[in-house]
């Protein structure tokens, strides 16, 4: 560690790898709400947050665990779940009267077609106005899980049971994932 009078210590949250203050300042400067997307190992979280004098205020929130309560049988951290979580958050935001937001991906790298941008596409498809470039969004077939379906079809029966044991435990064949995705999206439209 550096010593001496010229050494400058970074902010605690920056040292902990939690906050990029330069990016946060630019987002706060816009005066718009933030669409905050966080991907954990097992879940996806999407929130609409406003900056306040006494700290940030969460206006709307959606968690991929809530998809299971709506009947989602797939994984809660895959691209399809990220899209549906963003879609659910976008629908709830519109219901609360929030029409515009700025994407906040935190310290995650902006990788084309990633889960973060799948959640963004979900929020945009729900009707939320979020500035973005079309080139970063994943394609529709990937969001619906068609790549998983194709992979599952290429496996033999024993290998399929081994690789997709959790899906089969829950009563969902990976071959039926795109239809199941459409069904849950329709259910979100009806319930929210």
UniProtKB/Swiss-Prot annotation:
Coiled coil: none annotated. Keywords: Ribonucleoprotein, Ribosomal protein, RNA-binding, rRNA-binding. The keyword Repeat does not apply. One of its GO terms (cellular component) is cytosolic large ribosomal subunit. InterPro entries: Rbsml_uL18_euk. One of its GO terms (biological process) is translation. It holds the Pfam family Ribosomal_L5e. GO terms for molecular function: 5S rRNA binding; structural constituent of ribosome. Part of the 50S ribosomal subunit. Contacts the 5S and 23S rRNAs. Belongs to the universal ribosomal protein uL18 family. HAMAP family: Ribosomal_uL18_A (MF_01337_A). This is one of the proteins that bind and probably mediate the attachment of the 5S RNA into the large ribosomal subunit, where it forms part of the central protuberance. This is Large ribosomal subunit protein uL18. It comes from Methanothermobacter thermautotrophicus (strain ATCC 29096 / DSM 1053 / JCM 10044 / NBRC 100330 / Delta H). The lineage of its organism: Archaea, Methanobacteriati, Methanobacteriota, Methanomada group, Methanobacteria. The gene is rpl18.
């Amino acid at each position: 560690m550096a010593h001496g009078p010229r050494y400058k210590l970074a902010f605690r949250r920056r040292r902990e790898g939690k906050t990029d203050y330069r990016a946060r300042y630019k987002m706060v400067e816009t005066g718009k709400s933030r669409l905050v997307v966080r991907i954990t190992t097992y879940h996806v979280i999407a929130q609409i947050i406003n900056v306040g004098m006494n700290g940030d205020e969460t206006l709307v929130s959606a968690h991929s665990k809530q998809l299971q309560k709506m009947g989602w049988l797939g994984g809660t951290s895959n691209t399809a779940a990220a899209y549906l979580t963003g879609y659910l958050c976008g629908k709830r935001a519109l219901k609360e009267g929030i029409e515009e937001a700025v994407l906040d991906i935190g310290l995650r790298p902006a990788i084309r077609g990633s889960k973060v941008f799948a959640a963004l596409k979900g929020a945009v498809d729900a009707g939320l106005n979020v500035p973005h470039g079309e080139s970063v969004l994943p394609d529709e077939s990937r969001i619906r899980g068609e790549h998983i379906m194709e992979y599952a079809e290429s496996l033999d029966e024993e290998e399929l049971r081994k690789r997709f044991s959790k899906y089969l435990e829950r009563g969902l064949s990976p071959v039926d994932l795109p239809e199941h995705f459409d069904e849950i999206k329709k259910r979100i439209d009806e319930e929210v």
